[in-house]
Amino acid sequence: MFAYIKGVLAFFNPSQAIVDVHGVGYLLFIPCRLLGQLPQIGEPVQFYTTYVVREFSHTLYGFLSYQERDIFEILMNVTGIGPKMALSLIGHLSMSELQIAVMRQDLSTLCRVPGVGKKTAERLIVELKDKLAAIGHLDTSDHIEPLTQDPKSKSVQDAMLALINLGYNQTTAQKAIKQGMKELPEEIDLAQLITVALKHV
C-alpha cells in the first residue's frame, strides 16, 4: 500500500520514528541500527515501508533502503517469524552479516539476536538459504569478512539513550554524539563517547 514515505523527521527513538508529511505524522517502527544513521529532527527523510495488517492493528515498518525492506518482507515469511522478530534480526545484523550467517549455517551468530534460539536459527537457515541467494541484493562474493556485531553502531545507540535519559532532547543528543564521534578513534568505547559528547551539549 505504501512503497515509501518522504517528509520531515519529527521524532525518533531506538524503535520508532515519526515522519511529518504535510502536517500528517506517520508512525513507523524501525530497526535499532538506524538510530545513528537518521538525520536530525526537522530535516528531510525518506523511509521505504512495509504495511502490515493484523486483526487488531495496522502497522508501518520503515527502512532507509529498499534492500532492507525486501529482506524484512522475506524474513516475515519464514515459519514462526513475525514482524517483531524480523525487525530484531535486521536491527542486530547487517544484510551481509545475515546472508553470511545463513550461507555458513552459523547458528551462534543468529542466536546472538534477542529472541532467536537454536530452533529458530536452524529454521532461518533452512528457509532463507535459497531466497537470499536468489534476490541478488546482497554480496555473494567469496571475499567474506569475519562475522561480528557492529560495536560502533551499538555504542552510538547506547550513548544516544544515555543522553536522552540525562534529560537532553534528541536533536541535542544526536548533534553531540556526531561531534564526539569525530574526535574519537575508529574503535569507540561507550564511556568515552558519552564523556566526549557531554562536552558538546
UniProtKB/Swiss-Prot annotation:
Intracellular or extracellular location(s): Cytoplasm
Coiled-coil positions: none
Superkingdom to which the source organism belongs: Bacteria
Annotated Gene Ontology cellular component terms: cytoplasm; Holliday junction helicase complex; Holliday junction resolvase complex
Region of interest called Flexible linker, as start-end residue ranges on this chain: 144-153
InterPro entries: DNA_helicase_Holl-junc_RuvA_I, Hlx-hairpin-Hlx_DNA-bd_motif, NA-bd_OB-fold, RuvA, RuvA_2-like, RuvA_C, RuvA_C_sf
UniProt main location, coarse: cytoplasm
Domain III: annotated span: 153-201
SMART domains in the cross-refs: HhH1
GO MF terms, alphabetically ordered: ATP binding; four-way junction DNA binding; four-way junction helicase activity
Region feature (Domain II): 65-143
Domain I as annotated region, ranges: 1-64
GO biological process: DNA recombination; DNA repair
Pfam families (UniProt xref): HHH_5, RuvA_C, RuvA_N
Alphabetically ordered keywords of this record: Cytoplasm, DNA damage, DNA recombination, DNA repair, DNA-binding
Cited function: The RuvA-RuvB-RuvC complex processes Holliday junction (HJ) DNA during genetic recombination and DNA repair, while the RuvA-RuvB complex plays an important role in the rescue of blocked DNA replication forks via replication fork reversal (RFR). RuvA specifically binds to HJ cruciform DNA, conferring on it an open structure. The RuvB hexamer acts as an ATP-dependent pump, pulling dsDNA into and through the RuvAB complex. HJ branch migration allows RuvC to scan DNA until it finds its consensus sequence, where it cleaves and resolves the cruciform DNA.
HAMAP family on file: DNA_HJ_migration_RuvA
Assigned protein family: Belongs to the RuvA family.
Assembly and oligomerization: Homotetramer. Forms an RuvA(8)-RuvB(12)-Holliday junction (HJ) complex. HJ DNA is sandwiched between 2 RuvA tetramers; dsDNA enters through RuvA and exits via RuvB. An RuvB hexamer assembles on each DNA strand where it exits the tetramer. Each RuvB hexamer is contacted by two RuvA subunits (via domain III) on 2 adjacent RuvB subunits; this complex drives branch migration. In the full resolvosome a probable DNA-RuvA(4)-RuvB(12)-RuvC(2) complex forms which resolves the HJ.
Domain notes per entry: Has three domains with a flexible linker between the domains II and III and assumes an 'L' shape. Domain III is highly mobile and contacts RuvB.
Protein name (database record): Holliday junction branch migration complex subunit RuvA
